[in-house]
Amino acid sequence: EYPGCVAAYGIHPLYVAKAREEDIQVLRETIAREQPVAVGEIGLDRFVAERDDTQQLYYFVEQLKIAQTADLPVLLHVRRAIDQVLQQLRRIGVRGGIAHAFNGSQQQAAEFIKLGFKLGFGGAMTFPRAHRIRKLAATLPLDSIVLETDAPDMPPEWKVGARNTPDQLPRIAQTL
């Protein structure tokens, strides 16, 4: 229906509190039937105060297993949990993907790249205080970087308080 648009399916870590056990089976069946390009956005989010870490980990691992079985890459949402995510990726072995809104260290970046992942950079790197992440991005191989908007969220510095849109990508790329 929308030429050039493709789908990825997953249970975002901020929504696992609303998920049910049968959602994993529904996800498995939907992926087999619809053949999306990836599983995601999935991951771990240790930033929000009200969360169930055990439940997040369960849904993350189950979705990694689905991705591994379907031989699909994953789209990762990771906040304050990079090492835990890397541990599960090494343990389960998925076909790479994208670490969305990457904000880790040089060592963590190298580990993601070794596991077949691209690192996503977007609006967050345009803020003056984001010098560490800009410096890191500048050291990475160009083919390991994905520019992203996360529209309508995570606007660049010049759009604070406004809806983020894909037309901001060229200027975000200039910042990089």
Where in the sequence are the language-model features?
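Short, acidic/turn-prone active-site loops that include or flank metal/cofactor-
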Residues: 11-13, 103, 123-127, 151-152
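Active-site phosphate/pyrophosphate- and oxyanion-stabilizing loops and adjacent acidic/basic residues
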Residues: 134-135, 174
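Divalent metal-binding pocket/active-site signature
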Residues: 13-115, 135, 140, 154-167
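Structural detector of well-ordered beta-strand residues that form the stable sheet scaffold
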Residues: 6-8, 39, 75, 98-100, ...
